[in-house]
């Protein structure tokens, strides 16, 4: 899809861009594949805030996505490419030969009328889902499973892709977009191709209201708070942090501090860690 620009009729319009949605072929979603979802505004079952900066936003219905792709050897036709308000990628409506309908994440290059299939015997073409052991080395993939039958968990956002680097026994090596190289069971499934809607990252929001539509509330800097509200707060005017390292509102090191558990059982599957920034070793 292309990027649509606006004339600077107001300050908010100046610089604002949005996707032109030229790839979208169907506006109304499939009713049988919808579920209602409630907005929690970052509150838990006690009503206490557990995640900051959430609330409001437009009402959405959840589209039931088939991340598992276990309907093997039954060809499906792409009936429509649709917008999904719950994710950055678009979704494709499939109609199987037996009449069953389902949604999948729309990969780059998938068009209405294309045929897709899942299973070990499927061809290596965009939109087909196969076990990793049946995918050739060097293939670009997305929607990768971490546990057999659980459904794709990795590489699902707009423009994302991973590459199959090699096969070692019952594992395969994949390189993620973060440059991390990871071992995954060869019996896990993945879908061929990269996720579509790659221009999503080029969109300029332009005004605060569009962020509020997404259910995000303002993120106030700690340096403008009082010292009883944040470790960075207080001082006369624009005061420095006054600490050796930036801290979270609860006094923990942040910005570059590794938050992954050192004893995480899946650490042994990471062959090479992702590249980190200047503060990556704090």
Curated annotation (Swiss-Prot):
Residue numbers spanned by region Disordered: 26-55, 218-266
Classification via PANTHER family: LARGE RIBOSOMAL SUBUNIT PROTEIN UL2M, RIBOSOMAL PROTEIN L2
BP terms from Gene Ontology: cytoplasmic translation
Protein name: Large ribosomal subunit protein uL2
Pfam families from the UniProt entry: Ribosomal_L2 (PF00181), Ribosomal_L2_C (PF03947)
GO molecular function: rRNA binding; structural constituent of ribosome; transferase activity
Species whose genome carries this gene: Pediococcus pentosaceus (strain ATCC 25745 / CCUG 21536 / LMG 10740 / 183-1w)
Biased composition (Polar residues): 34-43
Matches recorded under HAMAP family: Ribosomal_uL2_B (MF_01320_B)
Keywords from the UniProt entry: Ribonucleoprotein, Ribosomal protein, RNA-binding, rRNA-binding
Gene3D superfamilies, per database record: 2.30.30.30, Nucleic acid-binding proteins (2.40.50.140), Ribosomal protein L2, domain 3 (4.10.950.10)
Entry function: One of the primary rRNA binding proteins. Required for association of the 30S and 50S subunits to form the 70S ribosome, for tRNA binding and peptide bond formation. It has been suggested to have peptidyltransferase activity; this is somewhat controversial. Makes several contacts with the 16S rRNA in the 70S ribosome.
Origin organism lineage: Bacteria, Bacillati, Bacillota, Bacilli, Lactobacillales
SMART domains, per database record: Ribosomal_L2, Ribosomal_L2_C
Record-linked InterPro entries: NA-bd_OB-fold, Rib_uL2_dom2, Ribosomal_uL2, Ribosomal_uL2_bac/org-type, Ribosomal_uL2_C, Ribosomal_uL2_CS, Ribosomal_uL2_dom3, Ribosomal_uL2_RNA-bd_dom
Top-rank taxon: Bacteria
Similarity comment: family membership: Belongs to the universal ribosomal protein uL2 family.
